[in-house]
Amino acid sequence: MKVLGIETSCDDCCVAVVENGIHILSNIKLSQKEHEKYYGVVPEIASRLHTEAIMSVCIKALKKANTKISEIDLIAVTSRPGLIGSLIVGLNFAKGLAISLKKPIICIDHILGHLYAPLMHSKIEYPFISLLLSGGHTLIAKQKNFDDVEILGRTLDDSCGEAFDKVAKHYDIGFPGGPNIEQISKNGDENTFKFPVTTFRKKENWYDFSYSGLKTACIHQLEKFKNKDNPTTKNNIAASFQKAAFENLITPLKRAIKDTQIKKLVIAGGVASNLYLREKIDKLKIQTYYPPLDLCTDNGAMIAGLGFNMYLKYGESPIEIEANSRIENYKNQYKRKNNEKNFSNA
């Protein structure tokens, strides 16, 4: 079965063709450079650019896969969570294709797509612990299957990637913040500043994260940095921030591994491409799986791959389904019961 995967939850316009849930025939992504001067994604610009680009990106994906649109068996599309305007563009495009081609459509949760991505590269047996790190999400989950996910902990404020972007903006390091901070940190001293690392002691927040304190502490160094008599460089600030940002992850992650007794770890999301983070994780001495770089960031392949499996198990989504920018109380919503409705159709 050939699945066309469409992902437009933020600022990347992504379309892919995947066969039988794992064989990637094409994986095309168009990143929107227009946001760089704003040091962040502008929702109105993102949705407009998706509208302009999605048809050409789809054509490129089909051409790369050597596949005619009539040969597509299923259309998978991200319907939640994300920027509502961007989601609507992708969802309406997918609906139009489904109706005109008389093909089934399956709507996919962006978070579950990221958690599925590593499975397209490595054969990983369930159960395992997943750590999702992206610009919009930071969470730890216990996975027993592609659709059996229990979120153990999540950020209570900023995501890890969002904190990188905001610090980079204040220090004029560039957007996106993650790769730019990683790059200049290589020439910095990570011990110049001791930024705060948040650890929760309450049972209900045992596996949770917080990045607002770290972000604020780093930004408060800005005035000292501007002082001409201060020898501190951007490299040192970036390196010190990066060190604290990833130390912030380690304690909750260790707790999850210890408490669940699960000895396999899967890292997903755009921040997973950070090599400094991978060095930190490798020190945990646990079997760890990373997706290739093109599956770390937003992509259509993960949506198509998960869509194949969701469709086989649950069937198609109703054509009336609407995009949803948020998932209220999502930590609890991902706890499934037997025969419960598909996440994507919730």
From Swiss-Prot:
Binds 1 Fe(2+) ion per subunit. One of its GO terms (molecular function) is N(6)-L-threonylcarbamoyladenine synthase activity. Its cofactor is Fe(2+). It comes from the Bacteria. Coiled coil: none annotated. Substrate binds at L132, L133, S134, G135, G136, D165, G178, N274. InterPro entries: ATPase_NBD, Gcp-like_dom, KAE1/TsaD, Peptidase_M22_CS, TsaD. Fe cation binds at H110, H114, D298. One of its GO terms (biological process) is tRNA threonylcarbamoyladenosine modification. Its EC number is 2.3.1.234. It holds the Pfam family TsaD. One of its GO terms (cellular component) is cytoplasm. It catalyses: L-threonylcarbamoyladenylate + adenosine(37) in tRNA = N(6)-L-threonylcarbamoyladenosine(37) in tRNA + AMP + H(+). It is found in: Cytoplasm. Keywords: Acyltransferase, Cytoplasm, Iron, Metal-binding, Transferase, tRNA processing. Belongs to the KAE1 / TsaD family. Required for the formation of a threonylcarbamoyl group on adenosine at position 37 (t(6)A37) in tRNAs that read codons beginning with adenine. Is involved in the transfer of the threonylcarbamoyl moiety of threonylcarbamoyl-AMP (TC-AMP) to the N6 group of A37, together with TsaE and TsaB. TsaD likely plays a direct catalytic role in this reaction. This is tRNA N6-adenosine threonylcarbamoyltransferase. It comes from Borreliella afzelii (strain PKo) (Borrelia afzelii).
